[in-house]
Structure formats: C-alpha cells, structure tokens
Amino acid sequence: MGHDIDQVAPLLREPANFQLRTNCDPHEDNFGLRAHGPLVRIVGESSTQLGRDFVWQAHGYEVVRRILGDHEHFTTRPQFTQSKSGAHVEAQFVGQISTYDPPEHTRLRKMLTPEFTVRRIRRMEPAIQSLIDDRLDLLEAEGPSADLQGLFADPVGAHALCELLGIPRDDQREFVRRIRRNADLSRGLKARAADSAAFNRYLDNLLARQRADPDDGLLGMIVRDHGDNVTDEELKGLCTALILGGVETVAGMIGFGVLALLDNPGQIELLFESPEKAERVVNELVRYLSPVQAPNPRLAIKDVVIDGQLIKAGDYVLCSILMANRDEALTPDPDVLDANRAAVSDVGFGHGIHYCVGAALARSMLRMAYQTLWRRFPGLRLAVPIEEVKYRSAFVDCPDQVPVTW
C-alpha cells in the first residue's frame, strides 16, 4: 500500500445490481466497478442511506483486508446521522459485537470464545451429526425430489445454533420461524418491527430464566461466568449477532455450496479423499461463495491514505468480501472452484478483530453437512436448471429453494 496520494478516484454511479449475484458468481456490475481500480467512490442508494454525498467501495483483496484489519482508522460503530432520505441510521446496537470497538469489543468477545474452542466444537459434533441425519431422513422421505434448502440447509444451521444458545427444544421451531421472518427484507418495515418486538419479548423471558437457573448452553455459561459484568441488553445483542451471523450464513453456505459442487462435480470426491482435503474443499467454498458479501460499513475516524486515495475522517467505506475473494491478487484463477489450489488467507469470515468468532464451528458443520449429504445421496442433482433457482432477500445471500432429485 502506498502512502502517496494519487489522482482522486472517479465518482461513479452505484450500479442497479450492485452486490447482487448471478447464481454463485458476482453480478457483472461488480466487475464493472473493478475496472476503475480496487477502491472507488460511488453515489446512489448506499450513499443516500448513509447520509453522504458519496461512499467508498473497496473490492480489491489487499485494500479490503487492510481496511477490515484497521481499527485505528475505522470503526464499525453506527453513528447518529440524518440521511438525505430523512431516515435515521441508529447509533449503536447494544451487545451486537460486530458494531463494537475495543475495549468493549474485547470484553464481550472474551465471553464468547470459550464456547468456540476446538474441544467444545468436538463435543458438539455428535449432536450436529444427529441433526444432519434427521434432516436428511426427512429429505429422503419427501423424495425422490425435494427442496434441499427448506428441508435441510435452513434447519441445520438454525437448530444447531438453538442448541448452542440453550433455546429449549419446544421453543426452537417458533424461534427459528421468527428469525427467518425478521431477516426477510422483502417484508415491510412495520411487519418486521412487530416480529422484532415479539422476538425481544421472548429473549427477555429466556434471559430471566437463565439468570435464575443457568443451563449448559452459551447463554447460561455467560450468565454463570460473567453475570455481574454483562447486562441483559448486551446478552440480547450477542444473541442477535450470533443469529444473524450464524443461521443464514450456514444456510447460505450449504445451499450455495451444493449448487457450486453440482456445477463442479470433480470437487465432490475430494470431500472423501482425506480429512485434510475435506477441510480444503470447505475453505475453498467459503472463499469462492462468500455468502456475507458486505460486512458492516466502516466509518473513517481519522484521515488515512489507502491505495493512493485519501479517505477522510467521516467517510464511509463499503467492503466487498465476495469481490476481494475473487481477486487475482489473492490467488490465480479466482473465479474457478479448485480445492487443490495453494492455501490462501481469504476474508470469507472477515479479518481483524471482527473475524467471525464461530468460523471453526461453521466449517465443521459445513464439512459434516456436505459429506453426509453425498454419502446418503451420491446421485444428487438439480431438478431445475440453475438459472431457475430463486434467491431470498435477506441480510446474507441465500437460495430461497434448491430443488433436487436423486
């Protein structure tokens, strides 16, 4: 990264299909932005929502990694601001760790990390495997054609997270339903606000029970070990962050992963070649698919020069994870799915202090899901052309349905 300021980046109109996909690949509009360099200025819906004349768009790997790892010059904490449309951007989501800076971020993250150690993940794997087996039993009973997304991909991540948090099993179905309704951006703000209020009431009751009698789930563990140092609002925020970051991400990675592997069948056999190769398949799918296309906007809190461009304090930067992971600066032939490529340090699960705390658990779940699916259904194939697969409007990219047959 140079420190000299080059000519100011051109101001570009935000494309209509900005941050959308064409099946498993970035929409071609994203490549149009890349032609102007790894860091550009755009004006459009994003700048209007953030109350700025323009925002920076970072899509080169080195630039994105630099920005995600720099909490000296950038913050993810939302600010009170009046946008041009009259809408307000909220100041802070209490407890949602992705919007915190040190030292508050450090305090909350330390509460979570014991639950995501390798030892803890190994202890969870039998329960996750049982859940995967049960969902595939239901898929098979529905067959020989069924919606893999609705019967398998969606429930696996959601119910595994419920078990992790300590959500009672009798509550899990309704809990998951509310998660999905609240994340559905196609529903109106009023409807989503009502769902959010009901969800918060449920969390209030759950936390009251955990305060009185903590169980062995993540919430119970935090209450037992840190009860005097964490508020209920922070606990609710941690729950929300884990739900938004975990449920849809795993669902999207299973659904998109199946689409990608069916389109690249030579990669499927690598899942069974060795544990190391299976791990590489999962890592390559995370790089190739990057279901969380754009993390929280970064707000510059100090002037900083990146890639020859002066980003001033008060400027917002949007980072494209998907485009960064499809950059030749990261790996040759980045638009090819190839688990045999040399290992890379992609940003599929983020980078820096906001690196996904549950990344190792997610990888373990994905490996088990892919392996068990193809062990049970070696003749799996799409029941429709991939162009007919529909995608949902949510915080994380995810197929709405994946019709399969076997």
Swiss-Prot record:
Protein name, entry field: Cytochrome P450 165C4
PROSITE patterns for this protein: CYTOCHROME_P450
Cofactor(s) essential for the protein: heme
GO process annotations (BP): vancomycin biosynthetic process
Keyword flag Metal-binding: yes
Function per UniProt: Involved in the coupling of aromatic side chains of the heptapeptide of vancomycin.
Record: residues binding heme: C356
EC number: 1.14.-.-
InterPro entries the UniProt entry points to: Cyt_P450 (IPR001128), Cyt_P450_B (IPR002397), Cyt_P450_CS (IPR017972), Cyt_P450_sf (IPR036396)
Protein source organism: Amycolatopsis orientalis (Nocardia orientalis)
Family label: Belongs to the cytochrome P450 family.
CDD domains to which the protein is assigned, alphabetical: CYP105-like
Gene Ontology MF, one: oxidoreductase activity, acting on paired donors, with incorporation or reduction of molecular oxygen
Enzyme class, first EC level, given as a word: oxidoreductase
Pathway: Antibiotic biosynthesis; vancomycin biosynthesis
